[in-house]
Amino acid sequence: PFTSGVFANVTIVGPKANRETPISLQYQHAAQLRRNSRISIYNSFMTGFPYGLYIDDDRAGSGQAFLDNELQIRNVILAGVEHWGGNGYGSAGTVFTGAPSNGAQHPTNPRGQALRSHANFPGGQAAYEAHFNTTAFNNTLMPKWQDSGLNPSVFEDGVINPVPVTGSMLLTAAKWDNTPKAGAFFQKVNYLGAVGTQNWTSPWAEWNCHIVKYY
């Protein structure tokens, strides 16, 4: 059987708010699609990870499904972290002070990438990038998350405010005319990502669940 769920208006934020933010080596990808996946992701935003979207063909199938439009990525923004790795993506253990100019940890030496493909991807990395950048799919590779108007509060500990800042392009960036698998189930909102002008996470969401005692 194929995994063929449809995800719309998702915001995925990793721990890397800026170049200097230290993060665990366990962080890898904002999204990793594998094992003959047929899922679709629409009107969604991802940032803050060493890698963006990984189509993992270690067990082949997902890459071809992507090229055949069975696995669909539409109206998705992958945003980097300013000055991280020279391309907005880098290793978790990046060191900046005193790094040699030709060293693996130098700020201008890319280590991660927005779009990552497995060696088994049909046609290789070039085919992946070309299909992702198909004009009709309306996908975006953004140099830094600040360009989107994402609320920086989302990187903080404790109670956050996920509502995009005033004037954010996220508030009006959604498109639905190229999302054939969305169907009637999804409410066709104008905003891209999980939150528009209303903070629907308040007051029921618990942002400190790792320290709260539940009885």
Show where each model-derived region lies:
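Extracellular beta-rich repeat passengers
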Residues: 1-215
